[in-house]
Amino acid sequence: ELTVVGSGWERSLLERLAESLGQAGMVTFKEHLDDKDKNIELQNAHILLHTSVREGWGLNVIEANAMGTPAVVYPVDGLVDSTIHGVTGLVCEEETPDSLAVEVMNLVADPEKYHMLRQNAWGRSHEFLWEKVLPNTCNWLENLASGKI
C-alpha cells in the first residue's frame, strides 16, 4: 500500500496513473495533515519515500525518523544531509523511479537491515531535539551578531 501526502500539480496525474495501472485501491491520497495525523501516518509507515529533486534540508525525513521510520531519498542536497546512507536510511544512486525501486526492493528483501535502519533513524532523530539544537543555534546567532563569525 502507498500513501501519498500533500497536494501538488502532479496529484491528478498520479491518481490517473494509479487508476490506469489497476492500483487505485492500493494508493491513498491525503491532503495536508495536522501534526497529530502526520505523526500517525509516519508511525504507521514502513518507509518514507522522498523524491524531491530540490530540498533545503528534509525535515520530514527527521520527523519520520523520530517515529522509527527510515527514509529512501533521492541524492540531492538536503536529503543527503538528513539521511545517512546505510545507517538511518538509503540514498538512491540516481534521481529516478527505477533507482528508488531498487533501493526499496533491496530493503524489503533484508529485514535485518530494515530493523537496523529503524533503530538508527530513531536514535539519530534525538540529535535534533530542541533541547540540543536550540543552545547551539542561539550561540551561533550571538556570535554572528557580535561579528565573531
State where each predicted segment sits.
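A short, well-ordered alpha-helix in the C-terminal region of glycosyltransferases
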Residues: 99, 106, 113-127, 139
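Aromatic "clamp/platform" in nucleotide-sugar-dependent glycosyltransferases that forms part
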Residues: 53
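Nucleotide-activated donor-binding/catalytic signature segment of Leloir-type glycosyltransferases, i.e.
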Residues: 13-33
